[in-house]
From Swiss-Prot:
Protein family according to the UniProt entry: Belongs to the TRAFAC class translation factor GTPase superfamily. Classic translation factor GTPase family. IF-2 subfamily.
Function according to Swiss-Prot or TrEMBL: One of the essential components for the initiation of protein synthesis. Protects formylmethionyl-tRNA from spontaneous hydrolysis and promotes its binding to the 30S ribosomal subunits. Also involved in the hydrolysis of GTP during the formation of the 70S ribosomal complex.
Region (Disordered): 50-217, 260-346
InterPro entries with a match to the protein in the record: EF-G-like_DII (IPR053905), IF2_II (IPR044145), IF2_N (IPR006847), P-loop_NTPase (IPR027417), Small_GTP-bd (IPR005225), T_Tr_GTP-bd_dom (IPR000795), TF_IF2_bacterial-like (IPR000178), TIF_IF2 (IPR015760)
Residues annotated for GTP binding in this entry: 441-448, 487-491, 541-544
Provenance organism: Streptococcus pneumoniae (strain P1031)
Region annotation G3: where it falls in the sequence: 487-490
Superkingdom of the source species: Bacteria
Compositionally biased intervals (Low complexity): 50-67, 129-141, 309-318
Alphabetically ordered keywords of this record: Cytoplasm, GTP-binding, Initiation factor, Nucleotide-binding, Protein biosynthesis
Protein name: Translation initiation factor IF-2
Keyword Cytoplasm: yes
Residues covered by the tr-type G domain: 432-599
Amino acid sequence: MSKKRLYEIAKELGKESKEVVARAKELGLDVKSHSSSVEEAVAAKIAASFKPAAAPKVEAKPAAPKVSAEKKAEKSEPAKPAVAKEEAKPAEPVAPKTEKVAAKPQSRNFKAEREARAKEQAERRKQNKGNNRDQQQNGNRQKNDGRNGGKQGQSNRDNRRFNDQAKKQQGQQKRRNERRQQEDKRSNQVAPRIDFKARAAALKAEQNAEYARSSEERFKQYQAAKEALAQANKRKEPEEIFEEAAKLAEQAQQVQAVVEVVPEKKEPAVDTRRKKQARPDKNRDDYDHEEDGPRKQQKNRSSQNQVRNQKNSNWNNNKKNKKGNNKNNRNQTPKPVTERKFHELPTEFEYTDGMTVAEIAKRIKREPAEIVKKLFMMGVMATQNQSLDGETIELLMVDYGIEAKQKVEVDNADIERFFVEDGYLNEDELVERPPVVTIMGHVDHGKTTLLDTLRNSRVATGEAGGITQHIGAYQIVENGKKITFLDTPGHAAFTSMRARGASVTDITILVVAADDGVMPQTIEAINHSKAANVPIIVAINKIDKPGANPERVIGELAEHGVMSTAWGGDSEFVEISAKFNQNIEELLETVLLVAEIQELKADPTVRAIGTVIEARLDKGKGAVATLLVQQGTLNVQDPIVVGNTFGRVRAMTNDLGRRVKVAGPSTPVSITGLNEAPMAGDHFAVYEDEKSARAAGEERAKRALMKQRQATQRVSLENLFDTLKAGELKSVNVIIKADVQGSVEALSASLQKIDVEGVKVTIVHSAVGAINESDVTLAEASNAFIVGFNVRPTPQARQQAEADDVEIRLHSIIYKVIEEMEEAMKGMLDPEFEEKVIGEAVIRETFKVSKVGTIGGFMVINGKVARDSKVRVIRDGVVIYDGELASLKHYKDDVKEVTNGREGGLMIDCYNDIKMDDVIEAYVMEEIKR
């Protein structure tokens, strides 16, 4: 079976598609829109549901539009009403049905409308007597023009255009005539003209009458009061008369005030302006007529974008409502002027250094100009964007009568505050922690051997030159209690490392060799421990040697303030032999005893804080830092700020190289995850989140850079001479690369302390890690050489150094680096020469030779006169000339020298004024060794 769509059914029924869709849904059909299709049986069912309008389907379609079209013809052709009526007669039988259809514009019969328009055009052509041509004729004419072409076609087109314009003008004139006829018919409906003078006179008379009615009561009251006063005056004395008159006058004023306050009821004012008559029957095409007469014809009437009804257009409405149109704005009330609100001054003002004038004005709700004026009166020239110091802000607030308080801001980037804040640790959560013990002493007194014995390992045998290069942190267990040991180098170059070890330690073990006694680094270690207020345990080592004398060591230490408990002091002394493991247990028990006396406590519940023991740059791991946790607990993935760098703890390893996830107080660990290698001795702190840690780290790095820039020495009158002198010095540029940060610091400090007159050391760059290509490039650019300490260059860096002729010096012992640097610095100095007199001679005779000069015959009286020596001419004890010899002869032979007691002849270069008895002094310049 075939199907039908709903809009087809609606077209057949003369209904709207949405009505058919709604009726189908009421019948229970599953349809979605007018495009849905149904079976023919279902379509018949839907059609049957529209019983009132279903019978005359086919006949109603042409009839309805004919009526509507011919009605339009009646409107457009008012001059021919008879023709329209005659054409409408055949549609009379179906008139009731077509009215229903005509009410639905969606079902218009376009064919009938086209026929009606064609008839209308035919009628117009008859009336114009052949001046207008139909569309078909115009089309034929265009075809003929196309065939003819040339000038004839152009002239035909011009004629056609002229005819079209004439036809258009005739049509417009016809419509204007028709509208004028309609205006004449409606002329009897125009309102009569208003006499404005009569209207104004009537309005004025009405106002005068109203005023008379309102003032009548006041006049009666005043007259009654006047009569009463006259009667009273007949019976009263003059004084009483004046008093009564005053009272009555007062009452009259009060009455008049009441009358003036009571508003008078006025009739609404009559609008006397001429009103425009309503024109409901006026067509939209009446553009060339208004009530006041004809107006200019609009141009470009055929444009679709032009607003045809200018009277109702938005553009004209906006133009009439503009601000400059006095006609529409005469009755508008002016906008009220906003008054500035008065704000009271605050009682307190919390400020920070560096606040600007604009910020202060906003806080106290005053204008910046007012504050600038007050500052000017105080003698301070400022603008609204200028920062003020705290003292100026306080004086300004005193002038306003406001109490000024400086705001205490918490610096998020300040790590040191965690170490000094009282409220950071929870007193209820404090537990006992392991002691941190630092082993200190002179070079080769057995510090690393002792630590090796404690750890039962042989790390000490691998140390180059018998000295420890960097701090090692280890933990051991004694009697169930942990002890953390720090090993510090004893060489003089590592002073900063020993001071750093003393600052983080709880107990110092001072190792002194029984055969050597007290040495310079021993005294330095004592001073560091006393400065840090750390108790000292003296371990007298090497008691197994034949020349050991512990008593001498005790006496020497007593001279430096370290007294034994046996001598009435507070330092414990233990005689040990680290090599043969003698009295090691006694030493550990002494350490635990001193730690118990100190009552060392820590809070493991807070975020971890501590100190960097060492830092290095690993090729595979990146920046590696050895940390000593002093308070709190350090966990993996904690956001951390270390010195001027930051990061997240990626991995942690203990002193045995095993990975751990948690590190408690007094625990040394190595961590990775920092973006840069920190400096040894820097503090670290764990933050709440990575965002705050990053902000703190970046802020600390920025401050460090600013501090470094501010430390640059500026030239002044005081240091001008030193600056000029320093410019004459020669410089040795050095790039230092080491395995750990402590060695880098020690090398830098030691090289800068080398004192060679005329030469200074400039550290171009120093870092931890292997020597790479960028180091070689920097050395070539800065004319420097590279010192590698316990590191090696990469193969690429070695090849580049050979190609660029960059010198790389590799060392593992620090004092060898210092000696080599001194020799290099001395070799850079300009040689110094010393004058040495080698002989004297006396002129016996002079000979003048033309074209040669003056030859002086001489006799050597002391030493010798050499050909390559310099000479001075001395006459009467005064040096006349100082120069070189041009020639030296013995008789006629050229000789290299003339010895004592012999005679010869000489010529002096560029000097001929030689006279008899002149003394010739010969001398040479010899280089002085430094």
